[in-house]
UniProtKB/Swiss-Prot annotation:
Residues 1-30 are annotated as: Disordered. This is Putative uncharacterized protein FAM30A. Residues 10-30 have a biased composition (Basic and acidic residues). Induction: Down-regulated when the beta-APP42/beta-APP40 ratio is high, which is typical of Alzheimer's disease. It comes from Homo sapiens. The lineage of its organism: Eukaryota, Metazoa, Chordata, Craniata, Vertebrata.
Length: 134
């Protein structure tokens, strides 16, 4: 059995339940905001970043230009050309000519290219002033 003094010491070491839930709520809201911002930036190809005046930090790698690359679209439709431009097969390109997998009508579901998404997330995080905590 502990003493009252020991219980008081333990209560000071650990935040109370309302403090813990408030901190969790703040972190969750912050994470949702980052996820929404990242999703918007992925949808628009980073164009709104330029419109809002945000600039990459000094020394940050450039944001890849994805508008000229093939991207996977709807379920079962595979690859499409964005804007009718041809693919330049840069290091960020995941077009079929570079061996990327296409979605198949036999395998329903969106074919996601996780290395490309991770590259984009890393670039987006390098543009922000604070690192993304996962």
């Amino acid at each position: 059995m502990g003493t009252l003094q020991g219980a008081a010491l333990r209560s000071r070491e650990r935040p109370s339940w309302p403090q813990e839930t408030h901190g969790h709520r703040e972190r969750t809201e912050e994470g949702c905001a980052v996820a929404a911002f990242s999703a918007d930036a992925l949808r628009t190809g980073g164009q709104e970043l330029e419109q809002t005046g945000l600039r990459p930090k000094a020394g940050a790698p450039p944001m890849p230009d994805l508008l000229g690359h093939r991207i996977c679209t709807d379920i079962g439709k595979g690859w499409r050309m964005d804007g009718g431009r041809t693919c330049s097969c840069s290091s960020f390109c995941r077009c079929p000519e570079r061996g990327a997998r296409r979605s198949s009508p036999d395998a329903p579901g969106l074919a996601l290219d996780f290395p490309l998404l991770l590259d984009l997330l890393w670039h987006l995080c390098s543009w922000t002033s604070q690192p993304l905590e996962l």
